[in-house]
């Protein structure tokens, strides 16, 4: 069986892979289905003139908020804007069934920021990227629904 690397597979292949894993998950753990819909969103911060101060990109999936990125302009750092974006994203996530949050950050980025906002370190992967480390943190957002 030939296996090839494809950096840009067709939409049909991407869709078939997504449907395949969703079907496997549904068959294996039937009650996962209500939580499988991905909800992608952004929390955007602007100043009074509409200039971009920063943003957060997140996805709600399997009752978990995945914070994919958070960026702040230099002039917005230390002003509470990042905290507001996190709080708004977490509130949105809870409204959409999320009970926890997960984020990856690197050694030169924002681990102390996330910890200050209630995130706990799960693991550190040294040497990713080379000479640095990736940190994985999580936070409980809400009690599980019965």
What are these regions (language model features)?
Residues 34-35, 48, 56-65:
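A conserved beta-strand-loop-helix scaffold within acyl/acetyltransferase catalytic domains
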Residues 102-104, 120-138:
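Conserved catalytic-core motifs of GNAT/GCN5-like acyltransferases
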Residues 93-106:
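Conserved GNAT acetyl-CoA-binding A-motif
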